Amino acid sequence: MKFALSLIALILLALIVPFFLPGAGKQAGVDPNSNLPWQISVDGQGGSTVFGLQPGVSTLGDVRQKLGNEIEVAIIAEPSEIGLLEGYYAQMPLGFVLAKMVVTVDATNEAISAMRERALKARHMESTTRRITLHPDDLAAADRLPIRAISVIPTVNLDEATIVQRFGEPGERIVVSDKRTHLLYPKQGLDVVVDQDGKELLQYVAPQQFARLREPLLAAPVENSPR
């Protein structure tokens, strides 16, 4: 399965739990004006920094150090697929925005297959998707691997006008269904999925890796909602 589409599907499954009330992200010890989703810096050499992390450079261990040890690390896999190695935060204050977050680890298929063989247990999530718990030795090894992408779903619904106000005008819009549109910001390495029926999804990669997100969207057929 293509990276972008599989990432969206697996993340939406992981983030299906209802969200909290607006303003709940204003927690003690959290600067409400820093680490916000639209505070993205680029280095002019194909890299970017968001939430104090650099996709493609920062490791899973860096994520723990920066955002906390509450992260849950597992392999998320659909039937007949190797799966993705992911870290999941059920609740993460990003400035004044409360969100759920998934970081995708840049692990090879061979490494993930080996981790699956040593895994302690597996359980089903939604449908036939499986969540596979790593052996402690593999958890330690995973901390040394770089993260490929960061995905965030804010607590509140964001319409397109609000997104444009915060992030600016997108470089491109790709409509994938009657209800879902991707707002692409290639210079920032950002894809914002606007969903009229669900929560919005923000996906961050290094700008030099933006084709990982864009190309599968161009190849996918437009889905029409049932009437």
How would you describe each model-predicted region?
Residues 2-23:
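Hydrophobic membrane-insertion alpha-helices, especially the h-region
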Residues 19-20, 42, 53, 91:
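Extended compositionally biased segments used for macromolecular assembly or nucleic-acid engagement
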Residues 21, 25-33, 58-227:
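A cross-family detector of function-defining hotspots
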Residues 36, 49-55, 62:
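Residue-level signal for functionally critical sites in structured catalytic/ligand-binding pockets
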Residues 38-51, 138-148:
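Acidic/histidine-rich, surface-exposed loop or edge segments in extracytoplasmic proteins
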Residues 40-42, 52-55, 75, 152:
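Generic structural "secondary-structure junction" signal
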